Amino acid sequence: MEKSESTKIDVVETNKERKGKAPLLGKAPVVAAAVVHAKGGGAKRGIAIFDLILRIAAFASALGAAVAMATTEETLPFFTQFFQFEASYDDLPTFTFFVVAMAIVVAYLVLSVPFSIVCIVRPHAVVPRLLLIIFDTVIIALTTGAAGSSAAIVYLAHNGNQDANWLAICQQFGDFCQRVSGAVVAAFVTVVILIFLVVLSASALRRHH
């Protein structure tokens, strides 16, 4: 039997051919990174758009709460020679604080809209989102304080306090109590929306890392 011999031929690549292939191998990670970056930007832009919508909703509820409380006044149809029975929001310092606090919240939400728009245009920007988180948290504290203190007064107006001999005035001033109750509810709605805004901004910052 004859033995067959095989010949091994080594083909040596030139430097020029190696240089021509090297960029092709290096482009894959770059393209993949660009795709991931684009997907992350799209998600953040969606979060920023939702943030803007929630800010508009919070503005509407805060404005409604401020206007409802500031225009609350009721005068009973009967009066005596010396007294006229009237109830107004500025009779109670707590309700006055409520109006001032909600006016500050409304002004802040208007001023925060440009920052929210910047986050839509530049979804990877960190500083605007960080500022929104900080100031949103401060505004949450202010709104919660105003709504909580006013809710206590509204409760007393509806139920009174027998131990302190505080009478429930809502039986006489029904319209007054309805308006202040609606204002307090709108303020708590604003608090809930602001909490969602902080969660959204924190989620967007987490995606950045």
Swiss-Prot record:
Record topology, Cytoplasmic segments: 1-46, 118-129, 201-209
Record membrane topology: Multi-pass membrane protein
InterPro entries found in the cross-reference section: CASP/CASPL (IPR006459), CASP_dom (IPR006702), CASPL (IPR044173)
Domain of life (superkingdom): Eukaryota
Extracellular compartment spans: 68-96, 151-179
Signal peptide start-end: none
GO CC terms of this entry: Casparian strip; plasma membrane
Key word GTP-binding present: no
Keywords: Cell membrane, Cell wall biogenesis/degradation, Membrane, Transmembrane, Transmembrane helix
Biological-process GO terms, alphabetical: cell wall modification; cell-cell junction assembly
Places the protein is found: Cell membrane
Pfam families tied to this protein: CASP_dom
Residues spanning the membrane: 47-67, 97-117, 130-150, 180-200
Main localization, broad class: membrane
Family recorded in the similarity comment: Belongs to the Casparian strip membrane proteins (CASP) family.
Function, in words: Regulates membrane-cell wall junctions and localized cell wall deposition. Required for establishment of the Casparian strip membrane domain (CSD) and the subsequent formation of Casparian strips, a cell wall modification of the root endodermis that determines an apoplastic barrier between the intraorganismal apoplasm and the extraorganismal apoplasm and prevents lateral diffusion.
Subunit structure, interactors included: Homodimer and heterodimers.
Protein known as: Casparian strip membrane protein 1
Species the sequence originates in: Nicotiana tabacum
